[in-house]
Amino acid sequence: LKAKRPDVEFVSEQWPAQGKIDAGSTLTATMASKPDAIFNVTFGADLAKLVREGNQRNVFPKTPVVSLLSGEPEYLEVLKDETPKGWIVTGYPWDQLDNKEHASFAANYYKKFNENPKVGSVVGYATMQAIFAGIKKANSTDNEKLVTAMRGLKFVTPFGPAEFRAIDQQSTMGAYVGKLDLRGGKGTMVQWRYADGKSYQPTDAYVKARRPADAMK
């Protein structure tokens, strides 16, 4: 962020032990530095405690928040009507997607498990699809042959097509970015868009300058 926006100043940092957050003291310390906004990466039970405490103190929605993962159904189902409006988040608006790949995946997932998919469901499915595609391309399960086959490999995900970049073997599978809102007493994502990974990954020149040449042998 500092590289893109040198004017941004981080006025404080809090690193609560995962699963053991003291939301009150964490927020007290954070707000003592008078931030214009908060960048959050807590999740699970820690996120629920932080949101509840912040709502009670009127920190949210008064102070803008950018939060990773918080738009995922795994966490919105826990937050319920405490979901903080206006947070900018990454997530998974599963009930609003209308692309063919996702419609088929979601319908089959519900039929199999009698529940709606979560982000973990999507990642697991996409991982298996990539493995299947790699084995098919390599026509082998040999490790080295699979490594070679997966460079530039294209595969299908519920979010749409993705690939492993040949230059650094990174997946281009992206993420949904939007804002949180409450509808029917439940948290949901609004004003969302799909951020395709290939549009945000480092340039070839950047990768070559930092990645050992023998890593691609």
Residue ranges of model-derived segments:
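Extracytosolic ligand-binding ectodomains
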Residues: L1-K217
